[in-house]
From Swiss-Prot:
Pfam families: Peptidase_M35. This is Neutral protease 2 homolog AFUB_070680. Binds 1 zinc ion per subunit. The active site is at E301. The keyword Disulfide bond applies.
């Protein structure tokens, strides 16, 4: 039933390339074979501007993360490494890479360490997705990446000799002995919150706002809505089982792959979920649209686990701006799409950025967000009008002005003589810009205090 719902949904949408912004900077990945299953990736900044991005869950991450996808006879080979959820701000400098235009770096890794290639034979290797860009050690947007397609002929005997990155542990209990005392209390509360939030999100996916659903999944199709609802219901069910479900939960890191930037990670091949130290610093439930918390981190991780709902999701777009740029088929397969949608349903965040920078800080500052909310473009049109609150900026040091009564002010450039609602006239653009309008409303004084 689960597989049928998801399969029919995916078949209903195009399986083409990721939906990419037209002018976005990008990273080009060139894959080549070093020997047998050892691969070299050359990462190149193909844009015209310097970029700083998060290389965790990407090339140069020393953890056994999914850097490439492997296919045998058009069927993807199971990944046996880890899928991490990263913090969105306060990133350490060692998690970041900066590349000048045209600059490159290399990463070598062995694909047999995170996949069973012991039968040998032909294997196809490729990768694509979005990598988060960072400003002031905070995720501020995304850039796309894609690679060539590499065809390998794997020597089975040599592949067998490659040690697996993850060694099996004794998983006799569903919630392990690492979950005691305060950590057990924290986990149980987080699971209850995750169950409640995922259940509400499942209902919203089935029959809630079509605009909100489209913001994250780019479709109003009944099949797509049913597929999203089914996965979220499965997540809610798993979180409600308090250790009796399909996943094994660790309250501390038995494998040693947590660091100061990782909230939690999942081993999809064994349906294991691990909380990192950073998890315990998160709020139980955030009040910020698209913020991170313990509850949605569990939702994110449970979507990775195929034992909860098959197949498990990937990390194709991380953070609000990347997740909402994905095509329908890719959003269905993206963990953060579910976590962010659940957060948006819970907080009623339709069309809101909630502190997440919507433009990418580089070549596309003028992003138009779902729900018809247009962001300012940072250049020639400072006087954008936002829905509802109609926030303006004066072109100088105070871009986020909010006018009383949702009244729109002049845009600081070519139209100073705006006529406002209720026939109230703004300053006339001539010699007396500091007019005092009816009802004691003082206009802009033609300098720095809008």
């Amino acid at each position: 039933m689960k597989i049928t719902a998801l399969a029919s949904a995916i078949l209903a949408v195009a399986q083409g390339a990721l939906a990419l912004p037209a002018r976005a900077p990008a990273l080009d990945i060139t894959l080549s074979q070093v020997n047998n299953t050892r691969i070299k990736a050359v990462v190149k900044n193909s844009g015209t501007e310097k970029i700083t991005f998060v290389h965790l869950n990407f090339f140069n991450d020393p953890s056994p993360v999914k850097k490439v996808s492997l296919y045998r006879n058009a069927t993807e080979v199971e990944f046996t490494g880890i899928k991490q959820r990263l913090r969105s701000d306060g990133l350490s400098n060692d998690a970041l890479t900066t590349l000048a235009p045209g600059a490159t770096y290399e990463d070598e890794f062995d694909i047999a360490s995170t996949a069973n290639l012991t039968q040998g034979g032909p294997v196809t290797v490729r990768t694509q997705g979005f990598v988060p860009i960072a400003m002031n050690n905070k995720i501020a947007g995304y850039i796309p990446y894609s690679s060539n397609e590499l065809e390998l002929e794997v020597d089975a005997e040599k592949a067998v000799a490659v040690p697996a990155s993850i060694k099996p542990l004794d998983r006799r209990t569903k919630i392990t002995s690492s979950c005691t005392g305060n950590r057990a209390t924290v986990l149980n509360t987080a699971l209850r919150n995750a169950a409640s939030i995922a259940s509400k999100a499942a209902d919203a996916a089935s029959s809630g706002s079509s605009a909100l659903f489209t913001e994250y999944f780019k479709s109003t199709s009944g099949n797509i809505r049913s597929a999203v609802a089914a996965r979220l219901k499965a997540v809610a069910s798993e979180a409600s089982m308090n250790g009796g479900g399909s996943t094994t939960y660790y309250c501390s890191d038995p494998y040693g792959y947590c660091d100061s930037n990782v909230l939690a990670y999942t081993l999809p091949s064994t349906n294991e979920v691990v909380n990192c130290e950073l998890f315990y610093t998160l709020q139980e439930v955030t009040n910020d649209c698209h913020g991170q918390d313990q509850a949605t981190t569990i939702i994110h991780e449970f979507t990775h686990a195929p034992g909860v709902y098959p197949p498990g999701t990937e990390d194709l777009g991380y953070g609000y701006s990347a997740a909402t740029a994905l095509s329908t088929s890719n959003a269905l397969n993206n963990a953060d799409s579910y976590a962010l949608f659940a957060n948006a349903v819970y907080l009623n965040c339709q069309g809101q950025t909630g502190g997440q920078t919507t433009w990418d800080g580089y070549s596309q500052p003028g992003q138009t967000e779902p729900g018809t909310q247009t962001m300012w473009d940072g250049y020639s049109q400072p006087g954008q009008t936002e829905p509802g609150t109609q926030t303006m900026w004066d072109g100088y040091s105070q871009p986020g002005q909010t006018e009383p009564g949702t009244q729109t002010t002049w845009d600081g450039y070519s139209q100073p003589g705006q006529i406002e609602p209720c026939t109230q006239t703004m300053w006339d653009g001539g010699s007396e810009p500091g007019q005092t309008e009816p009802d004691a409303q003082t206009m802009w004084d033609n300098f720095y205090q809008a």
